[in-house]
Structures are given as structure tokens and as C-alpha cells.
Amino acid sequence: MHSVTNAIPTGTIASIPAKAHAHRALICAALATSPSTILLSRTSKDIDATMDSLRGLGAHVVYENKIVTVTPGPAPAKGNVVPHESGTTLRLLLPVAASICNDVDVDAKGRLPDRPLEPMLGEMKAHGVTFSQDKPPFTMTGRLQGGQFSMVGDVSSQFFSGLLLAAPQIGLSTITSTTPLQSSDYVTLTTETMRDFGVEVEHTLPDTDINEAFTVPFGASFIGRDNYQIEGDWSNAAIWMVAAGMTGKPITITGMNKNSVQADRRIMQVMIDAGCDVAWDGMNVTVTGRASKPIHADLEQMPDMLPVMAALACSISGESSFVKGARLRLKESDRLVAVANLVRDLGGTVREEGDDLYIIGSGILKGGQGDCVNDHRLVMAGTLMALISESPVTLKDSEAITKSYPDFFEDWNLLGGNAQPV
């Protein structure tokens, strides 16, 4: 647990590497025809899970002095995927592992075995792979075959990314979304990273929102990269942007890409719409001014931003709305319920209507104990809520932050905040 007071952070902080970008770059490097070096200033439990799993699939992966050296190796007779609690690792690597190994053991921890893998498993079964059971831990048998893949687009975009990353190993493949593709920016991040490593993906976008297709041509192969830079992470930069908006004290985040395709870059517009100023100086972004206008956000394309936006909403007088959050029920926790409970526990007012959430902010919370339900993004939200709390906030399961941002509390204190283990 951690206890967080309302001491205000301000100043300049370096961005941490984008987890979504790092996962994809590491996988491309492990599948390449030559070694790669990837610049990664920090790691996390989720990134470690991907590196461990790539080792289990035959790659030689060494992380030293903020550089990952990836040397592709022959796939073992039996592969081993160890995603721990990382849904991204699991979903991206299931088809990748099946594209290079005849047999693969797959483990999982925490809530991960209960997170959805359909319709991807069904498509893999239709293309040559069998599973000992329908949720991990399980063993996959049979090599994934290329061809036509079709899936709904409203469960997880990671299914599309995983099949795209596997495609160069299995020949000509087309992956089609039979319903509108949600979190499509993450698929764009996948195709851009694949292009960086030498594989061009053909993207066909019809006039309607369905039958969006991605094709990887026959003969495509990944090539290694030297000193490949992982860009700054927007989902974690959002913590600092929201902190600035809640307190009115400026915070600058260095090493960010204004033109990133990361879905959570949308937090910039959220801050502007809430009345803050967002200014750029090269790759540094600064947020100034206290947020004053209620938030009205569609969660379909940025579901991971709900927890920190909920904290921001608590600091703004009036009703903020967060709609279309169905997929948040399938995260590390049921995030709609968990966020609502956290707001209530700390003295805020919130209303749930189906998959929508409405927060009636007053600018002040009482504080007290909040349950982060072993969800790293709830830890971020609870820490932010302490900024407007009358008494300290005690966060249960605060160690969950190591999933994505192990040094978070150290950085928080570095900028003048006060978070202490209890």
C-alpha cells in the first residue's frame, strides 16, 4: 500500500518508453533476419513478460544499459510463452508463436486467463492450430497457416495486431474486420512498427465501417534495426498532464512525439477542451492552467484513459460524461466498476448507466482508503485523486503500478508530490 497526500507535483519529467510500441518492436526484432538494438530507457513487468516470452520462442534478448539487443534464433521444438499478467503479450504472441513453433506451452497469471481470446482462437483453429483448452494455461499444437482471417472488431484490436505480426512467417494473409474496428490506432501502431522493420501492410478502408482489411504480401520478412528508438508513452504522460490540470501547476514532459499514432495522444485534446493550455517546444509538452470545463469523452478509441480522466473530472465542478466503455469491463479489472468504486470510496459522486459513467465533480474529495483492485491504472487514478483530497489517500494494491510504470512513485515524489509506502 501507499499513502498519498495532497502535496502538489510540478516541474519537468522525462517520458517513459511507450509500452505498446516496445512490445511490437521487440516482436518484430525477434522475427527479423538480422539482430537489432532497441533503445529502451526503462522497462516494466509487461515489457519483461514479452522479452521472457521471446526468449522462450528462441530469440536471444539482453537488456543492458538501457539498450535491448535482440538476436533472432531458431525456434525451439517446443516454445514457451509466459505473459504473466500482460494481455498484450498474450494476444500478440499467440499467433506469432504458432507461426514458428509446432508446439507451444502458454501460461498466464492473475485475471489474464479470464480475459477474452475469442474470436482470435477460433480463427487460429480454422488455420491449423489446436488448443488443449480454451483459456490459458494451455498447449497450442500445429503450425498457423496463412489465408483469409475474419473477426469482429469490437473485442480487442490486439487480435488484429497479433495476426499481422505473425503474417510474414505464414505467407500471404488478409485480416478483415467484420464490424467497426475499435482502438484502431493500436493496429496503426502495429503496421507502422512493421514498416520500420521492413514489412509493408496494405490497408483497405471501404466506404462503410465494416470489412476494413489488412494484407501482408507473400515473401515479406522483417529486417533488423540498429538503435531503434521507442517513443514516449502517452498513456503515462497523461498522468502528469492531468496532475497539472487538477492543480494549475505546470508540468513539462520531455521526449514526446506530437504526431504519434498512440491512441492515448487524445488526452491532449481532452486537456484543451477542459480549459488547459497545452504547449509544445520540440519534443517537450507543457500543460498549464487549471481545468475548469466538464469532460465529455467517447471511450471507444481511448479506453485506457478513463481512470485518469475520472480523477480530472472530480476536480472540475459539474457533470462529466464517459460513454461507450463496454470494453473496459475486460481489462485488468472491470474498470467501469472499479473507477466508480474508487471515486465513491474517496468521497466523490458518480453514476453508472449501462456502459457509461457520469461523474459529478465538486473540486474536493474526502480522501481515505481506495481499492486499486490490482490494476495499475487505478493506482494512477487514486494518486491523482489525492491532489484534491482533504485527508491522505491510502491505496490498496498500489504495487500493481509495476506492471507499466515501476518508478512512478519515485517520479511523483521527485516533482514534489508525497507518496509513501505503508
Language-model features, listed with the residues they occupy:
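Short, structured segments at the rim of ligand-binding sites
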Residues: 1-422
